[in-house]
Amino acid sequence: MPPKKAAPSKADLAKKQKVVEDKTFGLKNKNKSKNVQKYVQSLHQAVQPKPDPTKTAAKKKKEEEKAREKELNDLFKVAVSQPKVPVGVDPKSIVCEFFKVGQCQKGFKCKFSHDLNVQRKGEKIDIYTDKRDAETMEDWDQETLEKVVASKGAEYQQNKPTDIVCKYFLDAVEKKQYGWFWVCPNGGKDCHYRHALPPGYVLKSQMKALLEEESEKIAIEDEIEDQRKKVKTTTPMTTDLFMEWKRKKAEEREAGLAALRAERAKNDRMSGRELFMADSSVFVDDAEAYDVYERQEESEANEEPSNKNQDEGPSSSTSNGKEVEESDDEDINIDDDLDIDELNELEASLSRTSIQIREPGEGTSS
């Protein structure tokens, strides 16, 4: 096949257009004479590129199809009508009727849904509740209320409330025929039997599946044996092996605790219990710890009144005598509490110390 000719560029078209203008320049009656107009048109046609016949045919065919679709739309538009949207219902839950036949021109601006599966995505029917239970006096008008009051006596005798489940309802559920548009053969909504499964009710189809599942289950003993057979290295379990394993586990546990205690002791983070368990001798009090503390406390208590007596002077001699007697009694009581070693130490200290008693008048006379 010969190569296709390249499309003329704009520069070439401009040159040819200029040639046409040069040839038609100065012609008289260019706009009036038919012969001159034919000549000018022939020049223009010679300059302009010839259109592709295939593209022209495709464009013509496309225009014919659009005209045909427009004609069909005009014919079918009369028969298609959008449904009325009830109060409180989302329009997007209703499929657009024009979209079903491919005639909706609004696109995403259409208030109706363009999803054909929107009806399947709705709420599933509940087979464990009776739809008639939701009908209350709040939904009745005056006429309905009067009819109910007029026929209540006879209706109660005919349709007594019962908890028996309708056999037609059970049959429809078992055969998977129950749905939003199912009507009870026993009078429809007037059927006085329950159209709801009792709590915990298991259908026969479900029961069959459960029985098959239970039959396929393996007993625990058999499963243990199967798992035991899968183990390649088997060692018979005996009492000695078990005790050895238990001892190793205890040693590992003790080693772990010892390492943890050592780490905590290294970081000075041991608790009192851990310190006591590590070395209980640290927490033993000295034999004289309590007695020394008691003696110091009593000596401090005796020093305070003596200081007060020195500040008061000789006028309080009688009171001083009483305090001295009381202090002597306390010393006697303290001595009663001392043991033999402490008494020996006290006697030795007193023998090394020379006690000088000076009367108040002796200092002045000398």
Curated annotation (Swiss-Prot):
Ranges of compositional bias, category Acidic residues: 325-338
Keywords: Coiled coil, DNA-binding, Metal-binding, Repeat, Zinc, Zinc-finger
Coiled-coil blocks: 54-79, 208-234
Zinc finger (C3H1-type): 90-117, 160-198
A GO biological process held by the record: cytoplasmic translation
Molecular function as annotated in GO: DNA binding; zinc ion binding
Residue numbers spanned by region Disordered: 43-66, 293-338
Compositionally biased intervals (Polar residues): 312-321
A Pfam family recorded for this sequence: DFRP_C
GO cellular component terms, A-Z: cytosol
Keyword Membrane assigned: no
UniProt keyword annotation of Metal-binding present: yes
Matches recorded under InterPro entries: ZC3H15/TMA46_C (IPR032378), Znf_CCCH (IPR000571), Znf_CCCH_sf (IPR036855)
Protein name: Zinc finger CCCH domain-containing protein 11
